[in-house]
A protein has these predicted regions:
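Substrate-binding/access-modulating region of protease and related hydrolase catalytic domains
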Residues: 148-224, 271-274, 278
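N-terminal domain-start motif of subtilase-like serine proteases
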Residues: 55-82, 106-111, 327
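Hydrolase catalytic cores
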Residues: 144, 257-326
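Active-site-adjacent substrate-recognition loops and nearby beta-strands
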Residues: 67, 72, 210-229, 233-250, ...
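C-terminal subdomain of the subtilisin-like protease fold in secreted/lumenal serine endopeptidases
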Residues: 294-409
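Structural recognition of the beta-strand scaffold that forms the well-ordered cores
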Residues: 81-85, 138-143, 173, 178-183, ...
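Subtilisin-like serine protease catalytic core
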Residues: 71-82, 88-102, 110-159, 227, ...
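Secretory targeting and sorting signals
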Residues: 1-53, 410
Length: 410
């Protein structure tokens, strides 16, 4: 069993966003060995009966984060587009009636009931008119196959996967998403994922990803390990670190991981789940509210606000909760334009990729398409290497020689 020092919990700031009931809980960052390592969270029976046809209208996180107050003040995510990379979302779920959800997938997978339930739960946290963090946001859903999927359906064409992490991230960026929420483990992804994340950073798109539920350091198996990605761990409603939550150098913040009211995917009976998946969707939703409130702030400044408002003492970083549990109130109260226009999570503890130089080169169009085949299709080479033209017929990327903005900066 591993323990970290407990510390006093800062007082919450209205209208919402605090850790622990009334902000009085101590932060005991405690990790224990746990069997609760299910991909969608650990399941326990819910005590309250409900009918499957009725919408689930109560969630503990809704009162915990004072989201009713946020809605009353107009913080609903209106005008913001969130991308959800997960299984297929059941848009017929009563909790999602009235939500704006658009399936932007390029293909259709054959998923299990478990995978559909997980994706539907994530969509519920994000945009449900009843309990969603950002009920007026537009949600783009992208179908990703995972361990629970039955088959890849129409998603594999001529050996190319149309639903890989890098393909879906690039598609979400091209579709205009401002925030991407991913509550899935990844394993090894290769260089294509690195350039997809560089693409998101270059376009000012925030990726939020779960830390995992293995009660272990899982920095190598989740997207949070990458530069610029908001890795999310889980806390309990008393403010302590959740025993099931993984941790690692990629963690940036934390949020409540449960209990979350849902339906069992097999029996359709009420149950509760918990996990970093829920924490991730909560963080993505709160970032959408910050985007709505501060439309003129840059992505870097929004991220600066996230780490500077984290509830760790002095916002100091640790591998369990990053810079501290998210303070939703701080994100909408504090004007992020006061902060530097610099990405505070571009380089993570122990090193991460893409490097700052790789992101800068990608942004300026200076990564040669002859050096890697894994660049996004939308990438345009703007460097001065005229030898690239010799290979133009074999390349998928456009070439605009000598047009990099770096050449014109003073």
């Amino acid at each position: 069993m591993t323990h970290a020092q407990a510390c006093a919990q800062p007082a919450p700031r209205s209208p919402f966003g605090f850790v622990g009931r009334a902000g009085r809980a101590a932060r005991a960052l405690t990790t224990t060995t746990s069997a609760l390592a299910l991909a969608a969270g650990a399941l326990t029976l819910a005590p309250a009966p409900a009918h499957a046809a009725d919408p689930i209208t109560t969630q503990e996180y809704f009162s915990y984060y004072h989201l009713d107050s946020a809605r009353q003040k107009g913080y609903t995510g209106k005008g913001i587009t969130i991308a959800l990379i997960d299984g297929p979302v059941d848009t017929n779920a009563p909790e999602l009636a009235g939500a704006t959800i658009i399936d932007k997938s390029r293909c259709t997978i054959e998923d299990s009931a478990k995978g559909i339930r997980h994706a539907t739960d994530m969509a519920t946290i994000l945009v449900s008119p009843y309990t969603g963090v950002a009920p007026d946001a537009t949600l783009y859903s992208y179908q990703l196959s995972n361990n629970s999927s039955i088959s890849e359906g129409t998603c594999k064409t001529d050996g190319k996967k149309l639903n890989s992490f890098d393909t879906l991230i690039n598609q979400a960026v091209e579709d205009g998403a401002q925030i991407i929420s991913i509550s899935q483990g990844t394993g090894y992804l290769g260089t294509a994922a690195k350039w997809a994340i560089a693409n998101a950073i270059a376009h000012g798109v925030i990726i939020v990803a779960s830390a995992g539920n293995a009660s272990d350091d899982e920095n190598t198996t989740h997207l949070g390990r990458y530069s610029g990605v908001v890795g999310v761990s889980a806390i309990n409603t008393d403010g302590t670190f959740a025993s099931y939550s993984s941790w690692g150098n990629g963690v940036v913040t934390a949020a409540v991981g449960g209990p979350f009211n849902t339906l069992d995917e097999n029996t359709n009976q009420p149950t509760t789940v918990q996990g970093t998946s829920m924490s991730t969707a909560l963080v993505a939703g709160m970032l959408a509210l910050a985007r709505q409130k501060w439309p003129n702030a840059t992505t870097n400044q929004i991220l600066q606000s996230l780490v500077r408002s984290g509830l760790n003492p002095n916002h100091e970083w640790n591998q369990y909760t990053g810079y501290g549990a998210i303070d939703g109130g701080g994100l909408v109260i504090d004007d992020p334009s006061q902060y530097p226009d610099e990405n505070p999570i571009l380089q993570k503890q122990g090193g991460s990729e893409p490097t700052a130089d790789e992101v800068a080169d990608y942004t300026d169009g200076l990564v040669s398409p002859t050096s890697t085949v894994d660049l996004p299709d939308s990438y345009v080479y703007r460097g001065a290497d005229d030898q690239v033209v010799l290979y133009q017929s074999d390349l998928k990327n456009e070439i605009h020689l000598g047009t990099s903005p770096r050449y014109h900066r003073k």
